């Protein structure tokens, strides 16, 4: 097997040292024969990026572009998620697990300036640990000190120009996984532009109106040009440090062009016409595209079990802090949320909306993630059972007393709420319609509110909603989703009263009893380094989530994608995993 299991990976991370890795890309991502260099790779974005600074944005389209231009001290293998050296070619861990010394590669930024330890220190101090940077990672590098029970930041020390040391309050199991998402930025380009009296000024750096000449990269590509609402053009980073097995500097393509295509049907048409080389395929389009492929179409359509963060699994949330006091009490009632799960027809949603190309639930951990998945949740997850749901609602005192088909509270007011959902992707709306239909059959009125995705994000971020449908991508380690699933964190949006939003600190007194346990488990998972013990901790988290249903996980779509047949080095292995990386693909 080419894939390194996460359990093995975590064991490797506990080793005292990591040996220096060569600059040569692995054989699983490079072709068996020497490829042709040059040309342009065409991909698509669903909207214009809002920034070219990872830490100054909360925008998936920006993240997609930045992921091609920036990297961190360590990286995730683009397909298997295995940890591997990045800008740090090697590292050693102290016997107590509290100090990690990183040896940096002797490489240059795309403008020719040497990469040094100053860039690492600058990035952590100015962006990653800056609480007012939009995309900060304060939570990922703030660790519980087991000696006094206080949360403390990881401290970074410059040893010399090519060596940095991380000093941890306690051993930290997911440290390297978190580092893989910590892109390093250039001090020589950005430090002088930050207003020291206004820490949030970092959010104004490298906006999309900045000249590409002022933006440098340490990843395979650098930004060449940007035309708003049309395209982002990247070009090969002349100083990229990775090579293939033949000694060729990567990437193979001269350019990577992201076409900004907001309409899904237009994106599909461009893919069929060969104007987009590789893209995710919807379940609705999969059957037609597969038929076209089998009929001799110029593309290959892939289907695989879910292994990647996207497509994000949809969930349904109820706002515990809603202003309506009757709804607030109801939404905080575990029996009500369990009844709502019994009214969720996952089989119908998977069959009718996803063409059978999805798996139920799969919100916290994917079944393919053997290192962390807890199969017990499959027995806890409630099947569609309207009769049982109605009986539970009756027991809660929510009955239709006047015979109009709508249940009432004890006060006589109708049991109804607004379900907010973004207009795209279409399957969000479709799930909302199915859920609304079944709830109304059970006597609960649902007012569907469909809005622009940006507005919905703002509403959820402000806690200004009653119930909603949202989705967050899975990650190989639950630590990477701690800011979502741990109560009292920035993206635990259905119960913001458990968070001091000014101090970004949890308010335990405002948590429900089971939330306090989940909070404790996430902190325990962070400081536990033994893989078996970490799995047991996250097993309990999964069991709690599926028992008390803080949110109702709907389903997770399979990995569906399409590649132009002129695109080289796109393969699928025996396990169904599709191997594709922008810097090792080439034009045949």
Predicted regions and their residues:
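Active-site-proximal polar cores
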Residues: 554
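Acidic glycine-/aspartate-rich tracts in secreted/extracellular proteins
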Residues: 48-49, 107-108, 171-172
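N-terminal lobe/hinge region of extracytoplasmic solute-binding protein
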Residues: 22-27, 41-95, 125, 216
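Extracytoplasmic/periplasmic ligand-capture domains
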Residues: 4-5, 19-33, 75-79, 92, ...
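Surface-exposed binding/hinge segments that line
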Residues: 139-199, 227
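A structural "hinge/loop" feature
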Residues: 28, 46-64, 87, 113, ...
């Amino acid at each position: 097997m080419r894939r390194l299991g996460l359990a093995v990976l975590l064991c490797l991370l506990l080793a005292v040292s990591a040996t220096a890795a060569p600059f040569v890309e692995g054989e699983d991502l490079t072709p068996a024969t020497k490829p042709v260099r040059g040309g342009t790779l065409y991909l698509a974005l669903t909207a214009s990026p809002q920034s070219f600074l990872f830490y100054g944005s909360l925008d998936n389209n920006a993240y997609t572009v930045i992921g091609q231009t920036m990297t961190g001290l360590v990286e995730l293998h683009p397909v298997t998620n295995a940890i591997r050296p990045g800008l740090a070619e090697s590292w050693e861990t102290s016997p107590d697990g509290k100090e990690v010394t990183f040896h940096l590669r002797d490489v240059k930024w795309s403008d020719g300036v040497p990469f040094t330890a100053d860039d690492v220190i600058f990035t952590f101090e100015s962006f990653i640990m800056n609480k007012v940077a939009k995309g900060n990672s304060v939570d990922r590098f703030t660790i519980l000190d087991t000696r006094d029970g206080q949360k403390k930041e990881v401290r970074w020390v410059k040893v010399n120009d090519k060596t940095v040391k991380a000093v941890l309050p306690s051993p930290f199991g997911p440290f390297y996984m978190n580092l893989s998402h910590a892109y390093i930025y250039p001090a020589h380009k950005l430090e002088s532009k930050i207003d020291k009296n206004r820490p949030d000024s970092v959010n104004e750096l490298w906006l999309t109106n900045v000249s590409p000449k002022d933006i440098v990269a340490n990843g395979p590509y650098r930004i060449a040009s940007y035309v708003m609402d049309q395209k982002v053009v990247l070009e090969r980073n002349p100083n990229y440090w990775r090579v293939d097995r033949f000694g060729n500097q990567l990437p193979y393509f001269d350019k990577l062009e992201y076409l900004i295509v907001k309409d899904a049907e237009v994106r599909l048409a461009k893919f069929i016409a060969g104007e987009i080389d590789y893209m995710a395929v919807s379940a609705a389009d999969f059957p037609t595209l597969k038929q076209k492929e089998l009929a001799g179409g110029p593309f290959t359509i892939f289907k695989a079990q879910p292994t990647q963060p996207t497509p994000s699994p949809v969930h349904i949330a109820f706002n515990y802090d809603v202003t309506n006091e009757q709804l607030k009490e109801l939404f905080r009632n575990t029996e009500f949320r369990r009844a709502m799960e019994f009214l969720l027809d996952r089989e119908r949603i998977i069959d009718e909306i996803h063409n059978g190309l999805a798996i139920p639930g799969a919100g916290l951990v994917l079944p393919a993630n053997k290192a962390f998945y807890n199969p017990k949740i499959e027995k806890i997850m409630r099947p569609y059972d309207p009769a049982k749901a109605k009986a539970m609602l009756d027991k809660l005192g929510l009955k239709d007393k006047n015979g109009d088909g709508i249940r009432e509270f004890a006060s006589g007011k109708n049991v109804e709420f607004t379900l907010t959902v973004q207009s795209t992707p279409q399957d969000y709306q479709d799930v909302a319609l199915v859920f609304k239909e079944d709830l109304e059959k059970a006597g609960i009125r649902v007012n569907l509110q469909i809005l622009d995705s940006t507005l919905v994000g703002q509403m959820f971020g402000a806690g200004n909603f009653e119930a909603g449908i949202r989705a967050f991508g899975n990650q190989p380690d639950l630590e990477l989703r701690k800011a979502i699933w741990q109560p009292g964190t920035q993206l635990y949006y259905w119960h913001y009263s458990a968070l001091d939003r000014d101090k970004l600190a949890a308010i335990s007194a405002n948590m429900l009893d089971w939330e306090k346990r989940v909070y404790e488990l996430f902190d325990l998972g962070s400081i536990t380094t033994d893989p078996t013990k970490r799995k047991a901790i996250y097993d309990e988290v999964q069991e709690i989530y599926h028992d008390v249903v803080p949110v109702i996980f709907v389903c997770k779509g399979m990995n569906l994608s399409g590649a132009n047949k002129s695109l080289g080095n796109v393969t699928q292995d025996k396990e169904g995993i599709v191997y594709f990386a922008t810097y090792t693909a080439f034009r045949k």
